[in-house]
């Protein structure tokens, strides 16, 4: 137990000195050094999103592969990444046109 406690104290002391050394050499960022936040408003005052971001978002939302077309009675669950059964499929198994009635 004594060796483990000493080892823990030495590790804590090393970590604290490392943090102090990093803190001494730090300086404040200027506006040029600050990272550009993705999706932030334009800096030129016109508002809206940059053209590249709009183009990227349109590509994502219009691509059929991103929507993952599933067979009738199933819907794509983006969290699971698979097609999952819908409630209407459970209520009306084997008849996905139940709303139209029998024709």
Curated annotation (Swiss-Prot):
Residues 24-67, 99-103 form a propeptide. Residues 25-44 have a biased composition (Basic and acidic residues). Residues 25-50 are annotated as: Disordered. Expressed by the venom gland. Pyrrolidone carboxylic acid at position 1 has no significant effect on the structure of contryphan-Vc1. The modification Pyrrolidone carboxylic acid is found at residue 68. Disulfide bonds join 70-83. GO terms for cellular component: extracellular region. It is found in: Secreted. Residues 1-23 form the signal peptide. Keywords: Cleavage on pair of basic residues, Disulfide bond, Pyrrolidone carboxylic acid, Secreted, Signal. Adopts the 'single disulfide-directed beta hairpin' (SDH) fold. The secondary structural features of this peptide are highly resistant to thermal denaturation. In addition, this peptide can be truncated (90-103 DEL) without loss of ordered structure. Unknown. Intracranial injection of the peptide into mice does not produce toxic effects. In addition, the peptide does not produce any observable changes to normal or depolarization-induced intracellular calcium levels in mouse dorsal root ganglion cells. Belongs to the O2 superfamily. This is O2 contryphan Vc1. The lineage of its organism: Eukaryota, Metazoa, Spiralia, Lophotrochozoa, Mollusca.
């Amino acid at each position: 137990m004594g060796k483990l406690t000493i080892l823990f104290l030495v590790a804590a002391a090393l970590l604290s000195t490392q943090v102090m050394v990093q803190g001494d050499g730090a300086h404040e960022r200027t506006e040029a050094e600050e990272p550009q936040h993705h999706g932030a408003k334009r800096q030129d005052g016109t508002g809206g999103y940059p053209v590249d971001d709009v183009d990227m978002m349109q590509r994502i939302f219009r691509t059929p592969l991103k929507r993952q077309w599933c067979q009738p009675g199933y819907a794509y669950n983006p969290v699971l990444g698979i097609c999952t059964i819908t409630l209407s499929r459970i209520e009306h198994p084997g008849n996905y046109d139940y709303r139209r009635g029998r024709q």
